[in-house]
Design a protein with these regions (language model features):
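Conserved AMP-binding A3 loop
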Residues: 78-80, 211-235
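AMP-binding/adenylate-forming catalytic core of the ANL superfamily
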Residues: 91, 117, 292, 300, ...
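Conserved AMP-binding/adenylate-forming
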Residues: 49, 75, 90-138, 459, ...
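Conserved pre-ATP/AMP-binding loop-to-beta segment of ANL
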Residues: 65, 193-215, 222, 245-251
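Conserved ATP/PPi-binding loop(s) of AMP-dependent carboxylate-activating enzymes
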Residues: 379-383, 394-425, 442, 458-460
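Gly/Ser/Thr-rich phosphate-binding loop
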Residues: 298-299, 315-373, 385
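Conserved structural elements of the adenylate-forming
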Residues: 83-88, 226-247, 308
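Conserved AMP-binding/adenylation subdomain of ANL enzymes
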Residues: 234-251, 259-299, 313
Length: 555
């Protein structure tokens, strides 16, 4: 069942297409930059490769072959070189497929930002394969489960993760993506490229495009494989482009993790606009500033944890970032304090994107909206249907809090494990968050469905406690959550990292409670105040609650 009638669907599709084309034209997404040959190839490359990494690199290689495509820790690659290398790797993958008698290529990639992940992403589109982007934080047990559940037969992996190999790798062909040691005769990405392609199988004219499979960020058990399609015209791209002044030929620093849906999406947009990806394997705030300065980056694609580290760097205002025109943020929630600090340091250029691995982009707020409404996630983009429902499945009116459900053409097709449940209402898929629309139609996200707790009969969103405590002098960072209570069923607990100075040493549990009491209602006051040295985070910067020390209550 669809939330739209047939007539509404026609109107919705037409309006979404118009919004997409307007944003695409403004960003010169399908431009040819004066190259007649490139103009003639636009539709054929879309027909052959859809909106994939291969298509964007192939089109750019015909349009601006000598423009820098990638600047990473290994050097610089032009679009011509990147396309040539990706096609060589694709042909070598087809040779592996032929030699091993494989029905399909099912390629896993466990690599940090740079060519070690980008070239396999592009090779997937040229060869025709299913690609699994693996979290670099995966344990040996998780990898073992992923390999077996998904029948992965080829693996690109950075050699720093060699100790994560399960005991039984089966018949997986392993290729070292980034190497820090000499691996003898082992197959490496560099060796695949340098070997040439003279006697290798030809690339298919129309590859059989498999799914791009992104893994859930679960910290225990086997991460869920999320099957995502790669359509020809993903209209949701109009939302990505409209929230920031994106255009062709930019230098865009990408610190967002490319194995994550945000980093993967952003890299494809950079290549689609024939721009340059500037990245590094390991994030370092000083290096991030240096890259922006040295390469005169106009854009930064990042996550809050990364630009917070840049803001926390002493004397960060001495770095020249005058070239920056936008900071595109996603991956985890912005807090009001971080928004204020970012705008104060970089100017009103911060855009906020909201979505999930399963559902891609759900909403986006441009810099003007973020500056006025510090935590709004903005408008629903073209091509996306989003509704808010109560616990009984009824749609809630504007201004009221509801569970967020949505769909678009890039939404998951399912999970690699078909037994994994997908919660739907009227054809829309639950994203797992609570939110509301304000009077301007901007979406605000309050918390995860299961984060909200009831204390003494009152609803409490732990995020509101976090946002208040972030402003407390002597608090460096904080996480808030609900824990079980024998009397009130749930109670608020906080884990606080104090600043390493005299102010931080004066922060006590009672001082924390007093600060919350002065700013929020009594039911939001934390009974548990836990002081920790650091907060456990995953590769995208989200706090991992399971890895926090057990909460203790002071009676």
């Amino acid at each position: 069942m669809s939330p739209l009638s047939p007539l509404q669907r026609v109107v919705f599709t037409a309006r979404s297409a118009a919004q997409f084309l307007t944003a695409a034209a403004r960003a010169d997404l399908l431009g040819n930059e004066g190259s007649p040959r490139s103009a003639l190839l636009t539709l054929p490359t879309l027909a052959r490769y859809r909106f994939t990494t291969a298509r964007e690199i192939e089109q750019a290689a015909h349009t601006v072959p000598d423009r820098n495509a990638l600047i990473d820790d290994n050097g610089v690659l032009s679009y011509r070189d990147l396309a040539t290398q990706a096609k060589t790797v694709a042909r070598r993958l087809l040779a592996i497929k032929r030699e091993r008698g494989l029905d399909t290529l099912r390629i896993g990639v466990m690599a940090r930002n740079g060519r070690g992940i980008i070239i396999p992403m592009a090779a997937k589109g040229y060869a025709g394969a299913e690609l699994f982007l693996l979290n670099v934080g995966s344990s040996p047990e998780q990898l073992d489960g992923i390999f077996k559940e998904n029948n992965i037969n080829v693996l690109f992996i950075d050699d720093e993760f060699a100790d994560r190999f399960p005991e039984d790798m089966g018949s997986i062909t392993t290729i070292w993506a980034h190497t820090s040691d000499n691996h003898g005769e082992d197959l490496t990405l560099d060796r695949m490229i340098r070997g040439g392609a003279a006697s290798l199988p030809a690339l298919p004219t129309f590859p059989q495009h498999g799914n791009i499979v992104l893994m859930s960020s679960g910290t225990t058990g086997i991460p869920k494989g999320i099957l995502r399609p790669e359509p020809v015209f993903p209209m949701v791209v109009g939302g990505y482009l409209s929230a920031v002044p994106w255009r062709a030929g930019l230098n865009v620093q990408c610190t967002a993790s490319m194995f994550h849906t945000w980093g993967w999406s952003a890299v494809n947009l950079v290549f689609a606009t024939r721009s340059t990806v500037v990245t590094t394997r390991h994030f370092d705030p000083e290096k991030a500033f240096r890259q922006v300065r040295d390469y005169r980056c106009e854009g930064m694609v990042s996550s809050p944890i990364f630009f917070k580290q840049m803001l926390d760097l002493p004397n960060n205002d001495t770095w020249d970032t005058s070239s920056l025109e936008f900071i595109a943020s996603a991956g985890n929630a912005l807090t009001p304090l971080l928004v204020e600090r970012t705008i104060e340091r970089f100017g009103p250029i911060l855009a906020n994107y909201y979505g999930s691995t399963e559902l891609a982009l759900a909403a986006c707020a441009n810099a003007e909206t973020v500056a006025k409404k510090l935590t709004a996630v903005g408008k629903v983009p073209p091509g996306t249907v989003l509704r808010l429902y109560d616990d009984n499945g009824n749609e809630v009116p504007h201004g009221e809090v509801g569970r967020i459900f949505l769909t678009n053409e890039t939404a998951l097709k399912g999970y690699s494990n078909p037994d994994t449940e997908i919660v739907r209402i009227n054809g829309l898929i639950q994203i797992g968050d609570l939110g509301y629309f304000d009077e301007d139609g901007d979406l605000h996200v309050l918390s995860r469905n299961d984060d909200m707790i009831i204390v003494g009969g009152e609803n409490v969103h732990p995020q509101s406690v976090t946002e208040v405590l972030e402003r407390m002098p002597g608090v460096f960072e904080v996480h808030s959550g609900g824990v079980d209570d024998e009397h009130t069923f749930k109670r608020i607990a906080v884990w606080v990292v104090r600043t390493d100075d005299e102010t931080g040493r004066t922060v006590t549990a009672d001082a924390v409670r007093t600060w919350v009491r002065d700013n929020l209602a009594d039911h939001s006051i934390p009974r548990d105040v836990n002081f920790v040295d650091s907060l456990p985070r995953n590769a995208t910067g989200k706090v991992v609650p399971r890895n926090l020390p057990p909460s203790t209550r002071e009676d």
